[in-house]
């Protein structure tokens, strides 16, 4: 549709109508910039001109980048046109922070699904990277050494109890589920017991500053620190532990390596408005 003016004669009077321009796209990183790492199936910044994922199709192992629609949603039509009735595996999840920290997996059997037999994998109607089938790891190494100040979150669906789901970190898990009933944050047992180990569609968010560590599930404070071990080890994205593999689907994960504790509510609202988690 062209933008401009159009005239129409009504009862002898010329009336001019002005076409209304659509609102400009605004992503979460426009509102809360300077992320260290940012992965998502939605566009996160108006200034980001890259793609969301690189996908390998099972029919001939060809690969193609998959980007976004003007509204910021993943281009599902491009994805299904490329993959067809086959399976589509993620070989690269692009970092939208501008720091080039792309998560890459070159081993075919360890690549998670995004399309299964022609159907885009989803949670709550929104595309999701599916670790259920591969059940292994998808990572990059040594992005950065985390400082004390941090806001970190992921949007995921953990589907099988008893498997580690370490979204970020290796060694002492930076952020993720260590076992059936323990969530680790910054190398500490942040939350032990009292939650459903499969969890379903969940926003897990952690904040850290020099004096306080907090973890939230769906905007509810669940912090109960039991250990005091500091985080150590390399930085991985969606790691596994002792070959237990991952179990679930992931849609988004961002780290701000700075103090955004005051922005937690706004960040949570932005995420929940898009994904409809709680």
Label every model-predicted segment:
Residues 1-29, 106, 155, 167-168, ...:
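Extracellular low-complexity Ser/Thr/Asn/Gly-rich intrinsically disordered segments
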Residues 51, 127, 211-213, 233, ...:
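The right-handed parallel beta-helix/beta-solenoid scaffold, focusing on the short coil/turn
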Residues 47-59, 129, 167-168, 233-236:
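Short, hydrophobic/proline-enriched secondary-structure or compact coil segments at domain edges
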Residues 41-42, 82-86, 91-135, 143-146, ...:
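Extracellular glycan-interaction surfaces
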Residues 190-192, 229-257:
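Extracellular glycan-interaction patches encoded by glycine-rich segments
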Residues 3-5, 44-47, 52-59, 69, ...:
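Extracellular, beta-strand-rich glycan-interacting domains
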Residues 37, 74-80, 89, 93, ...:
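Early transmembrane alpha-helices of polytopic membrane proteins
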Residues 1-72, 78, 267-270:
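N-terminal low-complexity, intrinsically disordered "leader/linker" segments enriched in small/polar
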């Amino acid at each position: 549709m062209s933008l401009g003016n159009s005239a129409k004669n009504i009862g002898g009077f010329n009336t001019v109508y002005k076409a209304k321009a659509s609102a400009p796209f605004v992503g979460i990183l426009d509102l809360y910039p300077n992320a260290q790492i940012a992965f998502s199936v939605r566009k996160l910044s108006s200034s980001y001109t890259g793609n969301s994922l690189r996908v390998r199709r099972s029919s001939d192992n060809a690969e193609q980048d998959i980007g976004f629609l003007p509204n910021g949603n993943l281009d599902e039509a491009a994805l299904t046109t490329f993959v067809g009735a086959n399976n589509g595996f993620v070989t690269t999840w692009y970092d939208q922070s501008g720091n080039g920290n792309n998560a890459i997996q070159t081993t075919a059997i360890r690549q998670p699904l995004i399309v299964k037999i022609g159907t885009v994998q989803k949670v709550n109607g929104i595309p999701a990277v599916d670790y259920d089938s591969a059940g292994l790891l998808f990572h990059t190494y040594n992005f950065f050494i985390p400082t004390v100040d941090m806001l970190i979150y992921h949007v995921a669906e953990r589907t099988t109890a008893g498997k580690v789901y370490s979204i970020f970190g290796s060694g002492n898990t930076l952020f993720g589920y260590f076992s059936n009933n323990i969530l680790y944050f910054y190398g500490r047992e942040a939350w032990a017991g009292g939650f459903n180990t499969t969890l379903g569609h969940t926003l897990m968010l952690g904040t850290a500053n020099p004096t306080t560590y907090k973890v939230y599930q769906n905007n509810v404070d669940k912090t109960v620190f039991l250990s005091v071990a500091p985080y150590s080890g390399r930085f991985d994205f969606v790691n596994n532990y002792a070959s237990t593999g991952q179990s679930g689907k992931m849609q988004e994960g961002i780290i701000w390596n700075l103090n955004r504790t005051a922005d937690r509510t706004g960040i949570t609202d932005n995420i929940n408005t898009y994904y409809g988690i709680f």
